[in-house]
Amino acid sequence: ELPYISENGSAIHGLNLINQNFPNEIVLSRKKEELLKIFNEKTPERLLNKCVQISKLSKKEQEKIFGQKDDRLKDALKRKYTLPFLFNGNNSEKNKLLKSLSNNSLTLQEGGRVLNLCDNINKIKSMNRIIKILKKTEDKIKTIAVGDNYNDLEMLKNSDVPCLVFNDQFKLDKINIDNLIFSNKPSPEGWADVIKMALEKIGYSN
C-alpha cells in the first residue's frame, strides 16, 4: 500500500505509510454536498438545465458513460468531494459555465468521458502540499508526474520529470511541456514504460 491523491487533488491519503509522524489523511476540498448546493444556487438556470448528474442516470447509462460494470462502476461513482456530470451545451455555453463556477470558487475538471464539479483545488496544490511535508525529512526531492488526460497537464508542467501516457485525444505538437517523456502505448503498459524511463533519467536503479 502506498500514499495517493484522490478526486483531482481533493484529498491526500496514507502519508503516514512513509513516516508515522505524517498525517494519514489531508482533506483540501469541501464535501460534494456543499459544492452542489452552491452550484445549484449560483449557476444560471439556462446553463443548469444543460447539466446532467451521472448519479441520477440509470445503471445502464452509467455503465455506457464510464465503460465499467458492477464494483468498478460503484468505485467510479463513489465520490466524497467531486460530482461527475455531462454537459449538453456548446463550447460558448461551457465557457460561460466555467466563468460562473470560477466566480463562486468552484472549478470544472475534464476527465475523459465526463466533467467533474470540484472545489477550487487541483493536483498541483495537493502535490505541493505533499512536497512541503516531505521536505521536513528529505532535502532533495524530485517529482515524477504521470498523466494521461487534459486535467493532468498543469501537474506535468509543474513537475521535475513530466510523463505523458498515450491518449488518442492528444496531439503532441499542441502540448508545450519541456523535457516530456512520452509513451505511445496505452495504459497500463504506457504507465510502466514512462515510469521506467523517468527513474532512469534521475539516475535511480534497483
Spell out what each predicted region is:
Residues 2-8, 71-72, 162-167:
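Short hydrophobic/aromatic-enriched beta-strand-loop microsegments
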Residues 43-44, 100, 173-176:
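Short, conserved catalytic or adaptor-binding loops enriched in Gly and charged residues
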Residues 3, 50, 107, 179-181:
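Conserved beta-strand segments of alpha/beta enzyme cores
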Residues 18-23, 66-69, 197-201:
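Short, surface-exposed amphipathic charged segments that create phosphate/polyanion-binding patches used
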Residues 114-206:
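Mg2+-dependent phosphoryl-transfer enzymes with acidic/Ser/Thr/Gly-rich catalytic loops
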Residues 1-55:
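Active-site phosphate-binding/coordination module
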Residues 45-144:
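Conserved acidic, metal-coordinating active-site core of Asp-based
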